């Protein structure tokens, strides 16, 4: 029987897996790696490069190297996220029939076509590994992908020569890989933070059933955004020092992206990293070099609001599932960006328990997709996967209101209908405007498409009966139909251990480490002191802004002086631990007044709260006429 491959088509990296001999395993690519960069490049000779080879030449070919294509998949050109992507990406994002596309050397490609090239490579790698032709596939998408994005993903698979058996949600695939062998029912939360998207899903697993209880997320939040914050910081620092704006230089921008991504990765294990980009640009005075040190504390200060956004979403989804955090037995971390220490710390803090990191965050989604493929083919028996629609679906009705037909969180596949009528006398046609979202008015939701039902017999308003049916298949893709009950006329639309070192090299490294142990210790202490100092600077500035006028002028002046002293010391790359510690101590002493102001603020707030009259939680204030 032909094999089914499971594909995690990621923003940054992609992965392919297969289920054979009773287990799902990752298929290495031809380069021997388990993941393939989601990068496509076009050369001057007309070659198309995919994966590592495309990524390696990105700096010298920025305008013809396409990455993060998933961020504009299924996106309309007038959407806010499309405008942001266009401003960020070095290649040309253009409009094609109202939707986002990319232009390379005068030719326009849709995101589906670019994604298909990635899928083709994964397909070819799988065929080389398995020694047979592969056609059938299960492809994953972020749980919070809307209908347009899901349909575009399926189209990419078709262009790549794949028969897409199913589109499933990434957190659901991860849960399938994690929970398939669980005998007792348990509720788990999958926190999935990838390169370009964020999902959080609460599921119940056990006894071969994986049921989604609630899901939420942000299809435009991920590791790319962490990188962009580092890039912005580097650009601003360089501009302040030289007056040159690196964002206007596409080759420099590509080098910055690469450096930012590497810095982010290094800060997952190190307290400090150096970003060194020689000959980044040049002016009349000669070549310019960019050399900056970035501490983990500084980086965490940059990304804390984005991480906080994910924690807010966790709380919403747990509540939507009708659970408390204590009901969640395991928190499973998925996606490469969950390696960032601050992400782990904040999620752990939110639940007050250790995180489950037993799964490989880069591979588990593809592994789950392959399991789902085996379920569809019948190779895995008695497994039931119950997924849900992430957003409500409905149509526009009189007054521009969105009338929901399928509510968010409904288990799929599902089919629901509702009967509507005409708004005017003798109306012979109605326009069915299909929407997705949670807002009350049509204009605030995502428009999925519209179609007309014509030939309605003349009748007073409110008399004709038009049945609108929404049908979501197991892929989460929607078909809408409308039928005039009197005539039977109908219309529909598919919205569619090897370190690589020898023993001698290892022994030499051990001896070298012993010789430089004291120097290394001092350097490490200085880095840790710098890291703590960065954190103190950030926290002090944040507290000053929050307290504002509550800090007396004299105290504010003393704190600002100590703050500036510490900042000046930190500018000195060779500052010792003792020098930094002295300035930290001075700032800490000056900052005691901030703590007093903070406690005073908290006391006042609690006093006001206790002084007010307590209202019952279940009582809703209302006026009755």
UniProtKB/Swiss-Prot annotation:
Keyword field contains Phosphoprotein: yes
Keyword Nucleotide-binding: yes
Example of a GO MF term: unfolded protein binding
InterPro entries from the UniProt entry: ATPase_NBD (IPR043129), Chaperone_DnaK (IPR012725), Heat_shock_70_CS (IPR018181), HSP70_C_sf (IPR029048), HSP70_peptide-bd_sf (IPR029047), Hsp_70_fam (IPR013126)
Induction: By stress conditions e.g. heat shock.
Key words, A-Z: ATP-binding, Chaperone, Nucleotide-binding, Phosphoprotein, Stress response
Region (Disordered): 598-625
Pfam families linked: HSP70
Residue positions, PTM Phosphothreonine: 197
Family named by the database record: Belongs to the heat shock protein 70 family.
Function: Acts as a chaperone.
HAMAP family: DnaK
Record PANTHER family: HEAT SHOCK PROTEIN 70KDA
Name of the protein this chain belongs to: Chaperone protein DnaK
